[in-house]
Amino acid sequence: MENVKHIILVLSGKGGVGKSSVTTQLALSLHETPFYSRKLRIGVLDIDLTGPSIPRMFGMDAETHRIHQSSSGWVPVYTDETKEIGLMSLAFLLSSKNDSVVWRGPKKAAMIRQFVSDVNWGDIDYLLIDTPPGTSDEHLTIVESLLSVTSERPQLIDGAVMVTTPQNVATLDVKKEINFCQNLKIPILGVVENMSGFVCPHCSDCTNIFSKGGGEQLSNTYHLPFLGAVPIDPKFGELIESQSTEHPLIEHYKQLEVAKLFQKITQNMLDSLFHSPSLVLDKVLSGHRGRIWSVAVHPTLPLVATASEDKSVRVFQAQTGELIHVIDGYHTRSVRRVAWRPIDRPVLAIASFDATVSIYEKIDDDWECVAALEGHENEVKCVAWSHDGVYLATCSRDKSVWIWEAMEDDEFDCLAVLQEHTQDVKVVAWHPKDDLLVSGSYDNTIRFWRDDGDDWVQTCELTSHTSTVWALNFSPDGRLLASGDGEGEVFIWEKLVSNEDAARTPSTNILRPSLEEEWCLKAVLPRTFTEPVYTLGWKDDHTLCASGAEGTIGLFAYEDDVSTWHTVSLKEKAHDVYEINTIAWTNDSRLLSGGDDGLCNVWKLSEADQTA
């Protein structure tokens, strides 16, 4: 059990409400949920000893599929050769499926304890435990047994899902299950109302053959999440009865309409499990007369800057949203990017489509242009300061990356012009703790740059993207790099140990072997976007925000395994019908987003995030 990440009980107060059906569909939906970055490994433990249904639900004949013993314990029965869904049930141990189980409580308890102690699940993401009706020995035994082997887990059981039908006779018994969980301090993830209507197999209309809404009413009474209502779908029943090796449940289930319902139910359950936050609009920073291209938060001072195609930059007080100053009149074309120098006074680098970069500083009560950087032959697309404010990087449509050093008396010295990209360079970003620069381009590549003492050289090139790299952002600890592209993909990269072998690259910059580094693709975020991702922002080392052309803000996170990310929250139409070009986090965990509507929205996370 030590390699089981999450344990969820599925409970019902009364038999015949379709609890095993719900368990089966939760397992199938979790396995392929789009809210994770990969297919999940699922285990299903059937502790309904006298009436085990899980083998039949998955089409695994209990007389031909048997439990095997290995040196590390009992091996689950897997639904296919991928071994991504494993099953454990007493039915796999009985000599005949017609055998009755006439056991007293102590023998039942011993069997359940053996399931907990002897089954080798391997590394699985979720273990769903299908329980018998009521609150009896089996329920107490599974909880006590899990406690004895999972004492190091921060939470004994991650939660329980309640299954009921709409009728009062069913919801009455579920109330007892709720009390059971509350007495044992088991979190209740929510209620599923099963058999909520009947779907006609001919016209697909849904008719209420029982009462409706009992499960939702129960949720409201006990202030529990209502996960969703599931109608009786004859097509699902037909699939269960007709499945075979040639027509496995796992392949055909996803084509059913009920599968779409369970994807939503599964996401609601995950939201409850992870205390998923929602974005709530706090205030709006306005005043620009064109789209906002960039928003930047000062690292230490309560200042926010927004840059717009109206050729201006507006500076706001971060907490109140009060307009402090408007910087305009210098640039002759759209201002594409703005960046605060990470020092304890207000200094801004402003990049423009007029091919120049201006440096503004607040001196006394006014904002003055203290330097102008020229040299790019075309639009400057991005500007970024190094972690200590010593270096400034700029990139342009002219395919080049320039590195400047900030000198005394507001002077800037151009240290390098990097011309290895073959197309428009869209973005540059610095490592938060090291003098490492990355750049992303219309040529679909990400390139890494370091100072080798004589010149700035390319130390790594990543070519996994198949479209324009629009966004790059390092995690606050510098361990991970996120990249977003023109096809809506977001990649997560992690640095490997540097390779001391001699570098072989066609680059004009000669690379010393000791500087060569390798970054490995660790994850692709859950596929949320189909249009370009323009902007990325880390809330913390484990939580990343992404947005772009679709106008949806996505919040994603991982727990312990950096290769496994899940969707935390989605905010659709965050700027109505407009694209979002930029996001940034404030020091008090508010999110800023700037869009084509010319507005900078300030979002607060719901309180639930504080316990996630």
From Swiss-Prot:
Q: Does the keyword Kinase apply?
A: no
Q: Which residues form a coiled coil?
A: none
Gene Ontology MF terms? 4 iron, 4 sulfur cluster binding; ATP binding; ATP-dependent FeS chaperone activity; iron-sulfur cluster binding; metal ion binding
- WD repeat residues: 287-326, 330-370, 375-414, 420-459, 464-503, 528-566, 574-612
For whether the record's keyword set contains Repeat, the answer is: yes
What keywords are assigned to this protein?
A: 4Fe-4S, ATP-binding, Cytoplasm, Iron, Iron-sulfur, Metal-binding, Nucleotide-binding, Nucleus, Repeat, WD repeat
Top-level taxon in the UniProt lineage: Eukaryota
Protein's recorded name: Probable cytosolic Fe-S cluster assembly factor SJAG_02895
Q: Which organism is it from?
A: Schizosaccharomyces japonicus (strain yFS275 / FY16936) (Fission yeast)
